[in-house]
Amino acid sequence: MEFYRIGGVPNILANFAWEGAKPGSSVWNGKKIPLSHFLAKDPDWLANFHVWRMDWDEKSYRIFLDGELLNEMPLEKSVNAGKYKGINPFLKPQYLLLNLAVGNPQKGKGPVDDDAMPMRYEIDYVRVYKFPESGENK
């Protein structure tokens, strides 16, 4: 899940990615939801804590924000095509990274504007659960 400006408009991105056929490439399945969608429900949305959730089972994976499904991807579609052809990364052991990435020097955008600081990146807690082997997660 990312917060990103597209054409100057702030969006929440709910992305899945895996290896593409060309070396170093990725295949993306992403959904962009304008921040205004969340602000229309709650004008104070930016000041509040939110619950991000990712569920996956043997059939698909799903990204939720505050209980709202933002993106869903069938597991069968996320099979690597390059060096690791035929391997589905979501059937391998996983780890979790929590990261606040700012700026994008790779796209020539230059350094982060100091006037945009300070920014807040607060995490209250992280929980990891394992659903029963049957895949029941409802």
Model-inferred region functions:
Residues 1-138:
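GH16 jelly-roll
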